């Protein structure tokens, strides 16, 4: 059982959607902010409380069968099985498992089905399993075809960003060889602000690109780091800088992030600095 407190605009939305159901339960706190208390019999998917409850349950299940949580990443668990390490990386209920022995993987998958698979009346809820060298995980394509390295791409997701951008700015075609213009950090305080509808498009495109930046396109970090600071009151200059970034994404949509390790303990990073 969980208690969820909804506040502000979200309460207004719920009351507007179903006034007969929610209106009588909506109250205000001491500061005059609208609030709505909801008691859930089960964790409600999509809320912070639900994610936390599931995390506690899942990590408890793993530690009970001998897994240790990684001290540097609480969403990674390890266990030595038959002399080899099994690693489970998880994002809520999306898990990535690895072990040298296929039979060990079979047993772990069977355990996960027994503990967490729930088949609903409509037949949905079945746990899906992908095995092999190439996987789709959290929007990323993880390619382990080359021994000792992983190639990460998000081509489909980047295409979605570019499709949304083309609708917002049909004239923004073409490509760029750098992710950011030379005047990226220059702000003209007198520049005209974007109209509300354009500001929403700016916010959506920046947010979508940020997700790709964190996972597969770190070469866009500098540009997206600046643009995220401009979301509250974006100007036309900011849109021009976003257009530059979108053109770079179009030209590098298939460029992979390649990670590998050789045991030296030395971190090396190769970048194209021709535009620096």
Segments predicted by a language model, with ranges:
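Long, low-complexity, charge-biased intrinsically disordered regions
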Residues: 1-276
């Amino acid at each position: 059982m969980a208690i969820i407190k909804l506040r502000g605009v979200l309460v207004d939305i719920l009351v507007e959607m179903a006034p007969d159901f929610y209106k009588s339960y909506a109250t205000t706190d001491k500061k005059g902010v609208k609030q709505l208390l909801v008691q859930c019999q089960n964790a409600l998917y999509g809320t912070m409380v639900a994610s936390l409850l599931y995390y506690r349950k899942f990590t408890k299940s793993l530690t009970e069968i001998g897994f240790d949580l990684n001290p540097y990443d609480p969403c990674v668990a390890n266990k030595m099985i038959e002399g080899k390490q099994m690693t489970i990386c998880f994002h809520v209920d999306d898990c990535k498992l690895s072990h040298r022995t296929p039979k060990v993987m079979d047993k772990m998958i069977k355990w996960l089905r027994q503990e967490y698979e729930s088949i609903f009346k409509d037949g949905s809820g079945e746990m899906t399993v992908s095995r092999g060298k190439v996987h789709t995980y959290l929007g990323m394509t993880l390619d382990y075809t080359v021994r000792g390295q992983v190639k990460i791409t998000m081509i489909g997701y980047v295409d979605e960003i570019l499709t949304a951008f083309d609708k917002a700015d049909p004239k923004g075609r073409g490509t760029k060889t750098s992710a950011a213009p030379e005047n990226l950090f220059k702000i003209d305080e007198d520049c005209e602000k974007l109209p509300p509808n354009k500001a929403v498009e700016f916010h959506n495109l920046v947010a979508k690109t940020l997700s790709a930046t964190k996972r597969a396109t770190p070469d866009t970090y500098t540009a997206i780091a600046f643009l995220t600071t401009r979301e509250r009151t974006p100007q036309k200059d900011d849109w021009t800088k976003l257009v530059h970034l979108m053109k770079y994404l179009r030209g590098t949509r298939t460029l992979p992030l390649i990670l590998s390790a050789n045991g030296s303990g030395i971190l090396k990073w190769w970048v194209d600095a021709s535009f620096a």
